[in-house]
From Swiss-Prot:
Species this chain originates from: Escherichia fergusonii (strain ATCC 35469 / DSM 13698 / CCUG 18766 / IAM 14443 / JCM 21226 / LMG 7866 / NBRC 102419 / NCTC 12128 / CDC 0568-73)
Example GO BP: protein insertion into membrane
Full protein name: Membrane protein insertase YidC
Bilayer-spanning residue ranges: 6-26, 350-370, 420-440, 458-478, 499-519
Cell membrane as UniProt keyword: yes
Family as reported in the entry's similarity comment: Belongs to the OXA1/ALB3/YidC family. Type 1 subfamily.
Length: 548
């Protein structure tokens, strides 16, 4: 085995992974959404058994902080729209990214309220409460660190329910506090609920990037309990009515997409019921309902929960709820991606540029792997030295494959050569490469992060394809500088076109990943020369020109 065969192995592994990824994306196609008209009035009907109400018509009020621009419906107090001013919709756009939306084409809302036997949001008690508010617009003023949005409702029995949204400067966590004043003569039995609902199928204007070779990050529901730190729940599973229904103390429920998330975190000492529901009209929901509490006559009961609505910033999410930071989708290589991101973020705190941080982390990773790389090249050199003996052995033993295998193993043992020694570093590099890919695709910090010159977004492909071409050139030089024992004409042709094949694949890859691969190839060229000089002194390498 030589370095060119290693390139072939890399290509086969890479292509196999991309085929598997495409198969994963297509094997469970999203169900076709029905018309979503009038979903604001029928949204939660299928969840009635949970005591979760349908929406209704009310007045829309605006709530703005430095990082959130929310629209809340006074009918029930649901958050029907959420804009994120700090995150542009697109590069160089003045429009903020919209996370929550209520339109005929797409529904994504954060519902909450008070249900249970005596809750005003219980469908059995009539329409959802129509809250009174002091004004139609609330804005966090300069010098103000907290904004409160109180909403009040008094039922026919004179009981007063106050729902207060509390937002803080620079914070994507919204506290939702409830106060229940019992004006009657009997105890009130109240439960809190929080529900996230979303159209299963994305409309064309939101479904971007699905036609290229990029890895597809998870979009769907998720939940966390003390027993299950993080569990995904696919939309198509909900659409098939295979729904979640568990009890938990603590935890959270969420809906996820690339870079952004919404989550309800209940705060109570009792047990919560976590559920999913197919609401019809092509809409899926995940939510929680708390254990009922009693508010005695003449007393006031207090309950609260937290809504996260914003980017998946890991340290901030971890501070809001245990394991909420796990919503960042690093795929099955999360155990590599997470420490890589922490190291990258630490480097960025000094450098201030994510592109240069990627370059530095590449040098660190390749430096750590240098002993393995050296062992790989040494093993391949020893294998090349044994080729004449192996060829003679094959000629002597003919078609006796069992004898050939036995004598080859004896030869390897006598010469202290591991035939798999050249593959081991390869098996380590591939997961690191893929983990970096997941990190670039899942870390919101790298979304629209500029590098230099024409690279304005490291998470997007190079608009001029310059980096992929440079990557192909470096790969070509590595191939030309590597000694080879490949004699099969077909393998030789494959190796000749390998840089071209990789270049084509990398045209659609994030610029940050291509940058990593270019720097890694340049480091490989330098390390190659250093290792070959050492091997020459040991008589294991010759600088003879490669035969074409």
């Amino acid at each position: 085995m030589d370095s060119q065969r290693n390139l072939l192995v890399i290509a086969l592994l890479f292509v196999s992974f991309m085929i598997w990824q495409a198969w994963e994306q297509d094997k469970n196609p999203q169900p076709q959404a029905q018309q979503t008209t009038q979903t604001t009035t029928t949204a939660a009907g299928s969840a009635a058994d949970q005591g979760v109400p349908a929406s209704g018509q009310g007045k829309l009020i605006s709530v703005k902080t430095d990082v959130l621009d929310l629209t809340i419906n006074t009918r029930g107090g649901d958050v029907e729209q959420a804009l994120l001013p700090a995150y542009p919709k697109e590069l160089n756009s003045t429009q903020p990214f919209q996370l929550l939306e209520t339109s005929p084409q797409f529904i994504y809302q954060a519902q909450s309220g008070l249900t249970g036997r005596d809750g005003p949001d219980n469908p059995a008690n009539g329409p959802r409460p129509l809250y009174n508010v002091e004004k139609d617009a609330y804005v966090l003023a300069e010098g103000q660190n907290e904004l409160q949005v109180p909403m009040t409702y008094t039922d026919a029995a004179g009981n007063t329910f106050t729902k207060t949204f509390i937002l803080k400067r620079g914070d994507y966590a919204v506290n939702v506090n409830y106060n229940v004043q019992n004006a009657g003569e009997k105890p009130l039995e109240i439960s809190t609920f929080g529900q996230l609902k979303q159209s299963i199928t994305l409309p064309p204007y939101l479904d971007t990037g699905s036609s290229n070779f990029a890895l597809h990050t998870f979009r769907g529901a998720a939940y966390s309990t003390p027993d299950e730190k993080y569990e995904k729940y696919k939309f198509d599973t909900i659409a098939d009515n295979e729904n979640l229904n568990i009890s938990s103390k603590g935890g959270w429920v969420a809906m996820l997409q690339q870079y952004f998330a919404t989550a309800w975190i209940p705060h109570n000492d009792g047990t919560n019921n976590f559920y999913t529901a197919n609401l019809g009209n092509g809409i899926a929901a995940i939510g929680y309902k708390s254990q009922p509490v009693l508010v005695q006559p003449g007393q006031t009961g207090a309950m609260n929960s937290t809504l996260w609505v914003g980017p998946e910033i890991q340290d901030k999410m971890a501070a809001v709820a245990p394991h909420l930071d796990l919503t960042v989708d690093y795929g099955w290589l999360w155990f590599i991606s997470q420490p890589l991101f922490k190291l990258l973020k630490w480097i960025h705190s000094f450098v201030g540029n994510w592109g240069f941080s990627i370059i530095i982390i590449t040098f660190i990773v390749r430096g750590i792997m240098y002993p393995l790389t050296k062992a790989q090249y040494t093993s391949m050199a020893k294998m090349r030295m044994l080729q004449p003996k192996i060829q003679a052995m094959r000629e002597r033993l003919g078609d006796d494959k069992q004898r050939i295998s036995q004598e080859m193993m004896a030869l390897y043992k006598a010469e202290k050569v591991n035939p798999l020694g050249g593959c081991f570093p390869l098996l380590i590099q591939m997961p690191i490469f893929l983990a970096l890919y997941y990190m670039l695709m899942g870390s919101v910090e790298l979304r629209q992060a500029p590098f230099a010159l024409w690279i304005h977004d490291l998470s997007a492909q190079d608009p001029y394809y310059i980096l992929p071409i440079l990557m192909g050139v470096t790969m070509f030089f590595i191939q030309k500088m590597s000694p080879t024992t490949v004699t099969d004409p077909m393998q030789q042709k494959i190796m000749t076109f390998m840089p071209v094949i990789f270049t084509v694949f990398f045209l659609w890859f994030p610029s940050g990943l291509v940058l990593y691969y270019i720097v890694s190839n340049l480091v490989t060229i330098i390390q190659q020369q250093l290792i070959y000089r050492g091997l020459e002194k040991r008589g294991l390498h010759s600088r003879e020109k490669k035969k074409s």
